[in-house]
Amino acid sequence: MRVVILGSGVVGVTSAWYLSQAGHDVTVIDRESGPAQETSAANAGQISPGYAAPWAAPGVPLKAIKWMFQRHAPLAVRLDGTPFQLKWMWQMLRNCDTRHYMENKGRMVRLAEYSRDCLKTLRAVTGIEYEGCQGGTLQLFRTAQQYENATRDIAVLEDAGVPYQLLEASRLAEVEPALAEVAHKLTGGLRLPNDETGDCQLFTQRLARMAEQAGVTFRFNTPVEKLLYENDQIYGVKCADEIIKADAYVMAFGSYSTAMLKGIVDIPVYPLKGYSLTIPIVEPDGAPVSTILDETYKIAITRFDKRIRVGGMAEIVGFNTDLLQPRRETLEMVVRDLFPRGGHIEQATFWTGLRPMTPDGTPVVGRTRYKNLWLNTGHGTLGWTMACGSGQLLSDILSGRTPAIPYDDLSVARYRSDFTPTRPQRLHSAHN
């Protein structure tokens, strides 16, 4: 089958790889000059299935109000009055109760755990290297309340079968030696030993080369104007004066998916702006071993071979990609506070990207009412974590194979009022 994939980020490229391996003739189209040039370019670098959770959670609306008056707030909102933004925020607000949180987290952890298994298999089959490390993730707590919340929230991990270690502050240096110098600032941490790290852009670029060698065609520098449709099917992709035709079409345009699908399929994917710093390592012993998550500031600090990636924060500001100095100062503050000797911050590269976020946090993967249009978008801050699983899942569904995990509640159909999943999976409530 001829398949056209729109988008060459980590989700689009993994989709291309798995569809090609399933025997399909795949073409990837992107306006950029190469793969992973936008959202996948400089993300936090963590592959953390156990921490997969929606931003829409109990208590977030009240926290958002408090964050409005904080200099280093993890979330910022700038209202623009557009119906798109207001509707999305209202949908997110409706997901901030315990029942929805547990349903959404259950879906996300299921896909994220499966994705890690798919990445492990891909690594074994191809030998792909991307400065990866299987050193786990350590979530740091700065207050007694955060530590207390974690003791209750671990029931969620137990329900999903995710291994964990709850550590007091005195034990943090056992897994992250550089934290010995700052342990007095912390109350403890939650470690997930099975989590991984890696350079998402490097992975995507190398997998794209492997996919090209396997027969995938990449059409870079090719802006897409619109999808052409009639009745219940897509019949082409209009790119300038050219119409590219296929048997099936996959939307993996990230934050731009919603606009491209306007009038065809209504999906609630909104651009959630985030920032990162990439810092050269000065003293390896003063840098993190793997990934650190600062619970207070929602900042991730990840170790690559010779670099530290510091990423996080979320801004609901539409498609604005301005690099704001106060956001850089927040990233610098957190990394200086935890790893003062680790990196040469003055030489850091500052970056921003738009994460394609759904109001319930769960990506949109699967079929649509158009018989040859498929979606793989809306992964939010977890595109790197979920990419391989989403690509394999999409390939299986499109190819008529039975996927390894339940998937109907990942499709766009879940937003219908009459939707009932075939095999609903929910976690026992432990969120506070």
Curated annotation (Swiss-Prot):
One of its GO terms (biological process) is D-alanine catabolic process. It is an enzyme of class 1 (oxidoreductase). Its EC number is 1.4.99.-. GO terms for molecular function: D-amino-acid dehydrogenase activity. Keywords: FAD, Flavoprotein, Oxidoreductase. Signal peptide: none annotated. The keyword Chaperone does not apply. GO terms for cellular component: cytoplasm; plasma membrane. It catalyses: a D-alpha-amino acid + A + H2O = a 2-oxocarboxylate + AH2 + NH4(+). InterPro entries: DadA, FAD-dep_OxRdtase, FAD/NAD-bd_sf. The keyword Flavoprotein applies. It holds the Pfam family DAO. FAD binds at residues 3-17. Its cofactor is FAD. Pathway: Amino-acid degradation; D-alanine degradation; NH(3) and pyruvate from D-alanine: step 1/1. Belongs to the DadA oxidoreductase family. Oxidative deamination of D-amino acids. NCBIfam families: PRK00711.1. This is D-amino acid dehydrogenase.
